[in-house]
Structures are given as C-alpha cells and as structure tokens.
Amino acid sequence: MQKNYVIGFPRIGEKRELKKVLEKYWAKQTDFNEVKYVAEQLKKRHWNYQKEAKIEFISSNDFSYYDNMLDTSILLGAIPKRFESLKDEELYFTMARGNETCVAMEMTKWFNTNYHYIVPEISKDTKFTLNSKKVIEEYKEALELGIKTKIN
C-alpha cells in the first residue's frame, strides 16, 4: 500500500495574506495578535486542504513567519549575544530585520537561487538550548482539527 506526504506547504496564502499582515505589523499599523490570527487561519486552511486531498502524512512545523533557518536558530537557542535582551516576536523579527540598536543577521542566497535565508551565527560561545514551543504549539493546533501531523 502506497502512502503519500507533502514535505511542506507554501505559507504565504493564496492572496498573500501573510505578506500583507506582516507589512502592516512592521509599519505599526496592527499588532502581533493580528499576525498570529492570520497565521492560524492559514495553517488551518492548509492542513484542511491536505486532509481533503487525502494526504496521509501532513506536516506541522513547516510554517514560518519569516524564515525556516531563523526558526531553527530559535528552536536550538542559537541566539547571538546582541539579541539576548529581546524575546518573542521582537527577538524573532529583530534577528531577521534588525532595529535601532541591533544589526540584523546576514541574509544570503540558498545555493545560488533567488531564495534567501537568514544565516545562523554560531561561535564557540553559542549556548544551545532547546525551545520547542513552536513545534509543540503547531502540532497541538493541527490535533485540535483532528489532524495528527508528522513534525518537520
């Protein structure tokens, strides 16, 4: 018996909903609760699309507000010292975009394609600590819809 799965699902939304709400957030025209709401709606919609298409192994932890490599840095606690005083979405987006006092992490092309990613900053002083909050929350979100996911 064959089984099927999707490695990951596009996150931006058919009408670029994620991009639009993030731009409003960065312009201080909305708060992060609106961003989270849009993200939750997109994840639900995308998981249900896959369920309706009879995908047997649906992924969770494939959604990102900005960048999967940045998500991995957060997951592993690989936070550069200049960001240590920040937390939650302020930490996340400052690592990606910088702010008045912190320079953003480097962004570079993925294998010479037009896709860019945030380059992790790892040194001998990096203290790795697991932060599985996002992974567990997304798994539980899908479970509430009756979808038991494989975790990316």
Residue ranges and their predicted role:
Residues 1-152:
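Domain-level signal for soluble alpha/beta catalytic cores
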